[in-house]
Amino acid sequence: MRVTIVLNGRLESLPPVLSVCHALAETGHHVHLITNLIEPENAGELREKGVKITTFRKHPDIRNTSLPVRACRWLSFRWQIWNLLRKEQYDFLWIASAETALLMGKRLLKERYVLQMHELYDTYPVRIRKLKPLAQKACLVFVPELNRGRIFRAWFDLPEFPVILPNKPYRHPRKRNIPLTNEKVKSVIEGLGRDAKIVLYQGGIGKERDLRPVARAVSELGSPWKLVIQGILMGNDEYTKDFLANYEYTLVPPVPAPKHLETAAHAYIGIAAYVHDSLNTEFCAPNKIYEYTGFGLPVIANDVAGLQDTIGRYRAGICINFATADTAEIKHCLEEIDTAYSGYAACAAEFYEACDLKAIIVTAFERLRNRK
C-alpha cells in the first residue's frame, strides 16, 4: 500500500514515529514521510529502504504568541501540508500525532487516514473535544498503552478498540557497552570509570519527573554508584533549580534518537519516574522502558499503573512510590537488583522481546486492506 506519513515536528522528537517508518518500509509498503526536520543519518537509512522524504518549513511554534500570530502560523502550516498532499497519490495517510491532525483541520475528515496518538491530553479538554471527530473518522487509531486505548474509546465513542502499538524502538543494538560515537558523551561516560554502576535516567528534567529520591539514594550508596542524567530541561521552575543546584548527578548532553541508545548501553540500571498527577502520567507509555530493557537493564520505576503493568508485571525491575519512599527504601531497591541482577536482567530482556512491532503493523494493515 502507498502510505504517506505526516508529522508536524522533528522526527527524532518522537522515536515511535521513526519505528513506524522502518516497520512500514520493511513490510512492503511504499512510504512517503513528510516532516519538518530529520537527522541526516536517519534520513539516509530510511531512503535506503525506499522511503521518500519531504521536509517543509519549520513548524509553527504557537507558544507564548498572540492569537493572531498563532492563527497565521496554523494557516501557514495547513497550506503547506495540503499543497504537498495535493500532488501525492496514496492509499492512506498516517497522521503521526494528534497535534498534526489538529493543525491539518477539518479537511482531514475527507481523507482515508489512520491516527497515531502519543499522549492522553486529559488536562487539555479543548484539545480532546477537537480531537473527537478526527479520531472517530480515522480508519484506525493507534495508541501506545492498553488503558489509554480504553479511555480514548470511551471519550471519543470509537466504533472499535484502538490498536495498541507500544513505544518500542524498531531497531535496538541489544549489545551492552557498544562504542560511544558522540565525543562529549564518550568523555563523560569514560570519565566515570570502568567499574561505575551507572543508574541512568533519560528524558525530560522537571517536576513531572521527580528524580530527587533516586539522587539521594545513589549519593548515599557512594562509589561505584553514579546517577547519570541525559535529557533536556522541561522548565525553569523552583524544582528544577533546586535539583540542578543541590543534588549529586552527572549530566550527559542529549543526542538525537537513536544515538541515545549508546548511552543506555553503558548503564547498569534504568530509571522511569512519573508522578501521580494526571491520567497521562498514571497510564504512561514511555519508550525509555523498552530502550532500557532492550539491553537487559533492570528498571526502578515509580508505581504508576503504566509502569506496574509493564515493568512490575514482568519483574523487569522494581516499582515503588517515589513520593513516599524514604532514601533507605530506594537504596534497598538498588541493592536488591544488584544482588539478584542476572534474574532481573533476564526478565527485562523477556519484557522487551514480548512485543513484536512488525506483527502488530502487519495485522493492522491487513484490516485496512480488507476495507478497500
Please describe what each predicted stretch is.
Residues 264-282, 297:
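Acidic donor-binding loop of glycosyltransferase active sites
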Residues 180-183, 262, 322-329, 338-370:
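A charged, aromatic-enriched C-terminal amphipathic alpha-helix characteristic of glycosyltransferases
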